[in-house]
Amino acid sequence: MARLSLLTLLALGSAALAKKDTFQTKCAALQHKVKLPNVHVNFVEYVPGGTNLDLPDNAPSCGASSQAVSTDMCRIAMAVDTSDSSQITLEAWFPRDYTGRFLSTGNGGLSGCIQYYDLAYAAGLGFATVGANNGHNGTSGEPFYQHPEVVEDFAHRSVHTGVVVGKQLTKLFYDKGFKKSYYLGCSTGGRQGFKSVQKYPKDFDGIVAGAPAFNFVNLISWSAYFYSLTGSNTSESYLSPAMWKIAHDEIVRQCDELDGAKDGIIEDTDLCHPRLETIICKPGAKDTANCLTGAQAKTVRDVLSPMYGVNGTLLYPRMQPGSEVYAAGIMYNGEPFQYSTDWYRYVVYNNPDWDDTKWSVEDAAAALAQNPYDIQTFDADISSFRGAGGKVLTYHGLQDQMISSDNSKLYYARVAETMKLPPSELDEFYRFFPVSGMTHCAGGDGAYGIGNGLGSYNGVDPENNVLMAMVQWVEKGIAPEFIRGAKFAEGPGSAVEYTRKHCRYPRRNVYKGPGNYTDENAWECV
């Protein structure tokens, strides 16, 4: 018996080795099999699981010199021409443990950065995964300068081109091709997801689009607007991070328990309309460490108010309350916001010397009138996507410090009004989940671990993983009624302190008891 067991083990080992060799051989042969128009293969390599992959060609500003890879995969890197004067850098990661699903990742900010962490995440879940650099390298908007083709890549063409090429490569590499196609992105990646919904409705069966940067031109102007409110760090209207903490604590004091629980988390920011007069320093007060001046209180009120244009029309909704501490060092730091500066200098005015400290709503009007390649991405008629059978799931953190979650609520309302559909009808193809305690795409004070990436992973169960929830919706017809978030005790990957079910909009979470606020069953969507 011992001899038979040994022979059996050897046979199994040989079969596994043969399987491994077959996969590696197939990977090595891929480079010479690619004969696609405008596609220039740079290299193909087999990458074993457990590798910390060096990324020497990744722009330093992208902030990733390496990426941990959890699964055996075949990596193909290429350049794809998008016009006579533009091209994208594209990578496809084909995992050994393939599930028959194709997925495209997105990007962030103004960046030309392949999001390798998303490639690793999706490939690790068995998706044939592609990611592109948006038509330029690095996080600056300078490559847009006098290069409209690069702007077009950024606006819509990069992701779509990557999808077209990626699907062809997937069919070339895997004998069975793919059965369903998906998208996963956040921020600019969220906007790209909705651009696919609006412009390329047949590209994906299921789209997960987080914190979308749609209403893009007005978002850029809104981000520029904050400097006009705060002024420089010597202005009387400026608040230091410590002062923003004072404001935040008062906002939480006024709004925390509106959901029924005192847990430091605002579950429904729509109910929160704080009055900051309560923390204005008294005349002649000697101790001003825990209060604000009248000018500073006005700044907070202005930040928490919508931005209107030259003719009084709404351009962008308010920053939702509760994000003050996280936004202080980014949006209200006494300096113009760099993405806004770059967009105005290199796209709107094509003038690298444009003075970003002089921005006004007249500039916002000029930018919106330009709207190159409809980068606004705010078309509310998504009937073609619905007709194609597509599903879109969007989420937005209610502590988002860079893109107001109120903008996602505005778009939801515009879709409902334009398509003349109540939430019960929208639910068939478009579901929106505000996530309390989540900052921009991940992180925050609450249960933000929804499985939208490596930094928020809490298992593959569809109830705990927003991407797998989309897979279940597309492939089994089971739509998510909630998305469960995990509150990590010490950050991503640490012990889960508690979980919370985040409600499908327009429902909101209310604490009913009788358990502690950490008990997800003590909450109810109403």
UniProtKB/Swiss-Prot annotation:
Keyword Nucleotide-binding found: no
Pfam families (alphabetical): Tannase
EC nos: 3.1.1.73
Endpoints of the signal sequence: 1-18
Binding site for Ca(2+): D256, D259, A261, D263, I265
Catalytic activity: feruloyl-polysaccharide + H2O = ferulate + polysaccharide
Enzyme type, top EC level: hydrolase
Active site feature: S187, D400, H440
GO molecular function terms attached to this record: feruloyl esterase activity; metal ion binding
Cellular localization per UniProt: Secreted
Cellular component terms (Gene Ontology): extracellular region
Glycosylated residues, chain numbering: N137, N233, N311, N516
Chloroplast in keyword set: no
Transmembrane feature ranges: none
Single Gene Ontology BP annotation: xylan catabolic process
Record keywords, A-Z: Calcium, Carbohydrate metabolism, Disulfide bond, Glycoprotein, Hydrolase, Metal-binding, Polysaccharide degradation, Secreted, Serine esterase, Signal, Xylan degradation
Coarse class of the protein's main subcellular location: secreted
Function: Involved in degradation of plant cell walls. Hydrolyzes the feruloyl-arabinose ester bond in arabinoxylans as well as the feruloyl-galactose and feruloyl-arabinose ester bonds in pectin.
Family under the similarity heading: Belongs to the tannase family.
Protein name as annotated: Probable feruloyl esterase B
Organism: Aspergillus clavatus (strain ATCC 1007 / CBS 513.65 / DSM 816 / NCTC 3887 / NRRL 1 / QM 1276 / 107)
